[in-house]
Amino acid sequence: MPLVRVPATTANLGPGFDTLGMALNLFDELKIEESSSPEIIITGEGEGTIPRGQENIAYRAARAVFAKVGRPPVPLKLEMHNSIPVARGLGSSAAALVGAIVGTNAILGGPLGPAELVNLATTLEGHPDNVAPAILGGLVASARDGEQVICRRLELPPGLVTVVAIPQFTLSTRISRGVLPAKVDLEDAVFNISRVAVLLAAVATGDLDLMGRMMVDKLHQPYRLPLIPGMAEVFAAAREAGALAVTLSGSGPTVIAFCRGRQPKVGPAMAAAFARKGVKCTVKELAPCNHGAVVI
């Protein structure tokens, strides 16, 4: 019975919309085995809300592996223990399907390599920015090339620490994407493209200050501002308290601050800014995770 540990992920990192993602040191665990009948057991985050039938995203992902390798599907038992908050912008759905894909691949003897796992996970998730770092770890830049996803992984600079402020309310990716415009100004597109390029160079050279300066965005965060009460105030509070950069984590509502080493004032400042807008949140300090999903 494979036990798979899958990291949380934060996507976009400011300018890298649907392109950049990073693994974080917070994990979901999934056990998977063949069974006489389908069974899904869920504990932890989402225990009372995540579907337990065969429509469950992890169960569907497991069956997709059988189809991918040309094997007839068999009933499966999945035991999921979730520590990643659901629908908060920390890659909970990516973790579920990646855990199932990696675990099923292990059951079948490992016929799929990392690139094939990323491609299958992207097909199921719809975009690679969470699933790629969940599989590969570190910071991953991804691009679609026809039917293929091209990924390159970077080790994260030592000394980087993140602080996440996780509001108690959920925000679905569907709603968060629904507020985005179909077209953007050329000037805004160039603004983001240039910053993604320099951001990746900063990561590669370990320049945390430059990395922080480049984590700004004009393509998605301004449009999502009305969906998250206090977002602008939380950004400002985190920077004032010592963060190098602050961005939305994925499509939100979680806000993530990037810091040089531990900055004990950042988390309380973010929580206080949310509280002033009537939003309760949980604050966690999370190290970047340089490994992806692992079979234990």
Swiss-Prot record:
One example of a Gene Ontology biological process annotation: threonine biosynthetic process
InterPro entries, alphabetized: GHMP_kinase_C_dom, GHMP_kinase_C_sf, GHMP_kinase_N_dom, GHMP_knse_ATP-bd_CS, Homoserine_kinase, Ribosomal_Su5_D2-typ_SF, Ribsml_uS5_D2-typ_fold_subgr
Enzyme class, spelled out: transferase
Residues that coordinate or bind ATP: 85-95
GO molecular function ontology, one term from the record: homoserine kinase activity
The keyword Transcription regulation appears for this protein: no
A Pfam family matched in the record: GHMP_kinases_N
UniProt entry keywords in alphabetical sequence: Amino-acid biosynthesis, ATP-binding, Cytoplasm, Kinase, Nucleotide-binding, Threonine biosynthesis, Transferase
Gene Ontology cellular component terms for the protein in this record: cytoplasm
Catalysis: reaction(s): L-homoserine + ATP = O-phospho-L-homoserine + ADP + H(+)
Pathway: Amino-acid biosynthesis; L-threonine biosynthesis; L-threonine from L-aspartate: step 4/5
Intracellular or extracellular location(s): Cytoplasm
Keyword field contains Amino-acid biosynthesis: yes
Catalytic activity, EC: 2.7.1.39
Highest taxon listed in the record's lineage: Bacteria
Disulphide bridges, residue numbers: none
Protein family: Belongs to the GHMP kinase family. Homoserine kinase subfamily.
NCBIfam families associated with the record: PRK01212.1-4, thrB
Function: Catalyzes the ATP-dependent phosphorylation of L-homoserine to L-homoserine phosphate.
Protein name: Homoserine kinase
Organism (species): Moorella thermoacetica (strain ATCC 39073 / JCM 9320)
